[in-house]
Amino acid sequence: MASLGLFLCLSSVLLMSLCQVPTAIEDERKASHVYIAYMGALPSKISYSPMSHHQNILQEVIESSSVEDYLVRSYGRSFNGFAAKLTESEKDKLIGMEGVVSVFPSTVYKLFTTRSYEFMGLGDKSNNVPEVESNVIVGVIDGGIWPESKSFSDEGIGPIPKKWKGTCAGGTNFTCNRKVIGARHYVHDSARDSDAHGSHTASTAAGNKVKGVSVNGVAEGTARGGVPLGRIAVYKVCEPLGCNGERILAAFDDAIADGVDVLTISLGGGVTKVDIDPIAIGSFHAMTKGIVTTVAVGNAGTALAKADNLAPWLISVAAGSTDRKFVTNVVNGDDKMLPGRSINDFDLEGKKYPLAYGKTASNNCTEELARGCASGCLNTVEGKIVVCDVPNNVMEQKAAGAVGTILHVTDVDTPGLGPIAVATLDDTNYEELRSYVLSSPNPQGTILKTNTVKDNGAPVVPAFSSRGPNTLFSDILSNEHSKRNNRPMSQYISSIFTTGSNRVPGQSVDYYFMTGTSMACPHVAGVAAYVKTLRPDWSASAIKSAIMTTAWAMNASKNAEAEFAYGSGFVNPTVAVDPGLVYEIAKEDYLNMLCSLDYSSQGISTIAGGTFTCSEQSKLTMRNLNYPSMSAKVSASSSSDITFSRTVTNVGEKGSTYKAKLSGNPKLSIKVEPATLSFKAPGEKKSFTVTVSGKSLAGISNIVSASLIWSDGSHNVRSPIVVYT
């Protein structure tokens, strides 16, 4: 009887244990995430089936008869890999499998949210060839577009290029034409834009010319992209919550196979290694096909080492202002005019209104909250202009009956169109207005309509644009270009560019201004496409070099972070088509550089799609990658003696001779050997070394810069030289 009791007890324990096993597995399955398995280049075997291979791998990992339920995406058009729903233990098992380079979670990337091309020199008189320009295809990986916009009209554009291999799979309520020749969506049921970001970036890069554009009369002009006759292919990966990594990689997989020439992607995710970053992975394979990829460095502000998208095969773009600024003046009751900034299209006709500030704006909040225009506080502002210590609640002010608002701002950016009259004042002018309000028994004022004036101080890098140095590749300069991004106007679903969906709060507009490095990035994509039209046989690295070495040098006195803010300088597209010399980088050079960063030979072979050996002889340090700029991180407490090795290719005239010219900081001693390069013919290559010596930088500066210019009298090939601690 005792034995029977023991048996029943043990049976119960065993039964409970068996019941708990499925529960544990189910709990782990509920906690699964989407992971991306990157498997490098596609095998060369004709019989290879990526989908079958990926399903077989999952069969081993998941141990389920229906792995199709867990496979999210299979990448197999341009490179190899897949995305799948995996538990933590399944992910760990996958990491060690043959042919898998890396496994990483599909994280959410964020969007980096008319005069600009003329300021860059790409106006109506630029040297474009219509029949060639219309052969260039710009791929836009973003949030879709609004296809009805005039910026996406195919007026004046011929048949679709024969090289195009893509399709128009735009989904619900989306139609392509000879301008927008392709569309794919990886989220929702349509490639149609929902928040204007994608329409803005697409029209900035390659929008058709639209004359007589303005934002309700402000900044009238012609909206255009860098290649107005170029084609656009749309890859919608973003939704309001963000842009998943597995979708981004799928877009790269398709875009490369579709045959785009240039890709623009204004997204970032702060990834710390290139083999777990969908943008770095996708753009690497794009580079091997000659496709240029431009990316935004982000909007993290002036703190150092916050720049995003740092892989050296990318063109990383910071923001820069143009020579146009928008002035919105405030006039107080004493007729004192205070210069402000904003885009205000409301005409108050000079009428002065009561100014509501603090107690006169609210009777249900503290003085401090009311002065900050806190939510729920503005209950006595009807028919008044509200004065706010911080930018806050403009839509709430409109709902409360305010006719306008004056905001205190500390950065240089210009706020966008508002639902009521809006002006912003800097510290000095805001304090003067505040003093008037507090001292006057009946303070009044008005906000004037915006005027567009010339900004002779441009270009500068605005405060929001992310700064270097490069945290992934310490001896490679990040923020390669500063580009017009500060308030381009474009098709706002339309710099001006398009909007299309009229998403300006409280107003309906077709074209609008947007800011952020998101808007700088497609400008450089447009420039790259422009260079591609005139130099169709150039490699991606040659185009990048041409854009970098011909950029306008910028003034470090206006940007304390110097090259960490503006990189090589401000893009100069009309000169970039004829740089004289270029620094070319082959795929093998990048792979040899990865060797020096301790990536395995096996992993690099998989990336390369063939046998690749990392030897001591083949390893290429970051410092000696044939990059168009030169950068080195050094110890602050010791003197430095650094050598850079470079090779340039002649893309100019035969029989040309270039001499080295140096400009820079007396703290650095720079020697170039040889100091003269002579070329007999185009395509000829010449090598040289640059040796930089300097004393300790301790207590002096965290960045010291100079520049090397190779000049033949008509070309000036400029490379920044940066030493930092």
From Swiss-Prot:
It comes from the Eukaryota. The C-terminal propeptide is autocleaved. Keywords: Autocatalytic cleavage, Glycoprotein, Hydrolase, Protease, Secreted, Serine protease, Signal, Zymogen. Residues 352-433 form the PA domain. The gene is SBT4.2. GO terms for molecular function: serine-type endopeptidase activity. The active site is at D142, H197, S518. Glycans are attached at N173, N364, N555. It is found in: Secreted. Residues 25-112 form a propeptide. Residues 34-111 form the Inhibitor I9 domain. Residues 1-24 form the signal peptide. GO terms for biological process: proteolysis. This is Subtilisin-like protease SBT4.2. It comes from Arabidopsis thaliana (Mouse-ear cress). Belongs to the peptidase S8 family. One of its GO terms (cellular component) is extracellular region. SUPFAM superfamilies: Subtilisin-like.
